[in-house]
């Protein structure tokens, strides 16, 4: 089963989004998580990947720019993800070497772009049993052609206004530094 457990502290709204996505994937194969910049997307991504990997699953992680793969590796390493279970590739590269990849249990796409829907679809069609989880900060219309080709449902995070009003506009690195310092104080 794909159930993944929360291992590090997510904000309530982040946990809710991840839970909604998890729930959809019990019956469907693709979900897009749409959440604005500053909502702590990297934490949610790390959560999804870590829990899948902890169950022995392989992940294909698609980034839309090669430079981002370094950033993603850092995020995952920081959350103790076993990187030997994760292939981090641009969609072009993934498409070119699909036949060499370990078939993934989940394909995670960061910054899912409509313009690349065709390439994604080629990859998804090659791995028909893989679940698809996309993350984007850009609103998509759930009934648009590009969307329905790739995903079954969309879950939406809070608005930027809500994040600001609730003091939750996350700069995750800052938050983790603060938490680390607090733990030293307790000793």
Could you say what each language-model-derived stretch is?
Residues 4-32:
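Conserved pre-motif I regulatory segment
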Residues 22-23, 42-55:
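Walker A/P-loop NTP-binding motif
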Residues 44, 57-75:
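Conserved Walker A/P-loop ATP-binding site and its immediately adjacent core
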Residues 28-47:
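Walker A/P-loop
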Residues 58, 104-106, 129-133:
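Loop/turn-to-beta-strand initiation segments
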